[in-house]
Curated annotation (Swiss-Prot):
Main location: mitochondrion
Family indicated by similarity: Belongs to the complex I subunit 5 family.
Protein name: NADH-ubiquinone oxidoreductase chain 5
Source organism: Rhipicephalus sanguineus
GO biological process terms held by the UniProt record: ATP synthesis coupled electron transport; electron transport coupled proton transport
Subcellular location: Mitochondrion inner membrane
Known catalytic reactions: a ubiquinone + NADH + 5 H(+)(in) = a ubiquinol + NAD(+) + 4 H(+)(out)
Organism placement in taxonomy: Eukaryota, Metazoa, Ecdysozoa, Arthropoda, Chelicerata
Length: 552
């Protein structure tokens, strides 16, 4: 079943790739329209938009999904519910395509809610209390974004149209609704706690849902509303949120020991870079980084799943060092992914990250924002250095195994994604990135970019010594996402207590004035009236007998 759907998704992805080249080269787009109903002067229409951006994103989603299903054929082979898992993944892909191809706010809610529902089902796929708690945190955080989209639909009625292309100006409330919806789906502060918690899902779900498709839906929504960032208020707000998220996720990734959570925090960091690029009004550059990041991050998750699967569930990086002696191909692919994450020359993220840094230093005049950006970039280097150090030099192997016990079948989709990363990053950089852009930087700023790598190495050695000499130091504030997890849990528990109290009040009111109350009142009045009637009959009968005695 997995292989059949893999081949079908690859076929559809090739169609979207052809559409991308055709729409991009000829600079055209296609809109398919179907009128569902019309009420008074308002028409409800079903749209499908095929332009170069939607076709490229759809191609990426389908290609990654096909590799994940191919990978799941081996990864989920012993699971009893693998058929249900396959159908849930396909429903998720359908919801993602609806979100990408719909230029209509009213139809956007179909894909948006479909993503939230299917991601919740996939997070709780492994039935345990941890999965249930993670799923509840995920769906509650995403419900905030759903409410924002519904309010967007209400406000769109003022424009007498639901089409995104017909909206040329944005009011303050409309813009805030769009930004908050994007922040919830892309897990930016203060909605960041759900993304690491969602790592309770199977690793193929993390590779597809929580690295390359679901979390990028918020960024894609903001890319579609790129006119929003002509307003300085929205740009400044999004820039500050993204900078804080970048620093927070980098700190947590450096102090984390769980392999999947480290990759999840790096996803959070890269999403904040995409948001930062959008705040600078660099739409094509943000979209390019979104595509490249989706490829290499899904590949990193599949590498992590390969390691975890063959080590019987162990995912602590302190016990994974010698494993890569048994699988040098996976180590090579993982190193390419991490080099791309750091912006190593001519690999993946290099083409976008270097340009993003230069544009940021060119356009930003705020010293605090520049320092925050540098700190975030430094932590990106640091947690990658630490991951290299623990996987290759420092750690020990938790479970020794023979080379024959390693499942080779999962190597093929990982290798395909690696080749796809190397080809796509070069090709997309030629097509999307600006050819002639004058970037004027001072001599100090140029040297700052060059000295980041040796400075990060020096900071890495200092922090390693710091952790070594203080092994029992409680870094709760840094390791719990600045207490966002506890804050989210507290709000959820407080809401539950409030709802419980309100439900008790509701039951009390229902008891008094609802159906039960009406029933009790009717019974009381009936019994009272029957008592009165019985008394009247008794008195009348007694008087009749008394009169008969007197007369006769």
């Amino acid at each position: 079943m997995f292989i059949n759907w893999t081949m079908m998704l690859i076929s559809f992805s090739i169609v979207f790739l052809y559409m991308f080249f055709m729409t991009f080269y000829f600079n055209i787009f296609f809109i398919f329209e179907y009128n569902l109903m019309s009420i008074l002067s308002f028409e409800y229409k079903f749209y499908i938009l095929l332009d170069w951006m939607s076709c490229m994103f759809s191609f990426t989603v389908l290609m990654i999904s096909s590799m994940v299903l191919w990978y799941s054929h081996s990864y989920m082979s012993s699971d009893k519910n693998k058929t249900s898992f396959c159908w849930m993944v396909l429903m998720f892909i359908l919801s993602m395509l609806l979100l990408v191809l719909m230029p209509n706010v009213f139809m956007l809610i179909l894909g948006w809610d479909g993503l939230g529902l299917t991601s919740y089902c996939l997070v709780i796929f492994y039935q345990s209390s941890n999965s249930y708690n993670s799923g509840m945190m995920t769906i509650i955080s995403n419900r905030v974004g759903d409410v924002m989209v519904i309010m967007m639909i209400i406000f769109a009625i003022n424009f007498n149209s639901f089409e995104l292309t017909s909206i040329k100006s944005f009011e303050l409330i409309w813009g805030l609704l769009i930004i908050i919806a994007g922040l919830t789906k892309s897990a930016q502060i203060p909605f960041s706690a759900w993304l690491p918690a969602a790592m309770a899902a199977p690793t193929p779900v993390s590779a597809l849902v929580h690295s390359s498709t679901l979390v990028t839906a918020g960024v894609y929504l903001l890319i579609r509303f790129d006119l929003l960032f002509n307003n300085n208020i929205f740009s400044a707000f999004l820039m500050k949120i993204s900078l804080m998220t970048m620093i927070m996720s980098g700190m947590n990734a450096f102090f984390e020991n769980d392999l999947k959570k480290i990759i999840a925090f790096s996803t959070l960091s890269q999403l904040s870079i995409m948001m930062l690029t959008l705040s600078l009004s660099l739409t094509n550059l943000s979209f390019f980084h979104l595509i490249v990041h989706a490829i290499f991050k899904s590949m990193l998750f599949l590498c992590a799943g390969f390691v975890i699967h063959n080590l019987m569930g162990n995912q602590d990086i302190r016990f994974l060092s010698d494993f890569f002696k048994f699988s040098p191909l996976i180590l090579s692919c993982m190193m390419i992914g991490m080099f791309s994450l750091m912006g190593f020359p001519f690999i993946g993220g290099f083409y976008s990250k270097d340009v993003i840094m230069e544009f940021f230093f060119l356009k930003s005049n705020n010293m605090i924002e520049m320092n925050m950006f540098i700190v975030g970039i430094i932590f990106t280097f640091l947690y990658n250095f630490r991951l290299f150090y623990m996987l290759l030099l420092k750690g020990t192997l938790f479970n020794m195994m023979s080379k024959d016990s390693i499942n080779i079948f999962m190597n093929y989709p990982i290798f395909n994604l690696t080749v796809y990363l190397l080809i796509t990053s070069n090709l997309m950089s030629w097509l999307l990135l600006p050819e002639y852009t004058m970037i004027f930087l001072s001599f100090t700023q140029k040297l700052m970019l060059l000295f980041l790598v040796p400075f990060c190495t020096f900071m890495f050695m200092i922090l390693l010594k710091f952790i070594k000499f203080f092994p029992y130091l409680k870094l709760n504030f840094l390791m719990t996402m600045w207490n966002l997890s506890e804050l989210t849990s507290f709000i959820m528990l407080s809401n539950n207590k409030f709802l419980l109290k309100m439900s008790i009040n509701d039951w009390t009111w229902l008891e008094m004035y609802g159906p039960l109350g009406i029933k009790s009142k009717i019974e009381h009045n009936y019994n009272f009236s029957m008592t009165k009637e019985i008394n009247v009959i008794t008195i009348a009968f007694s008087l009749t007998i008394l009169m008969m005695i007197i007369v006769y």
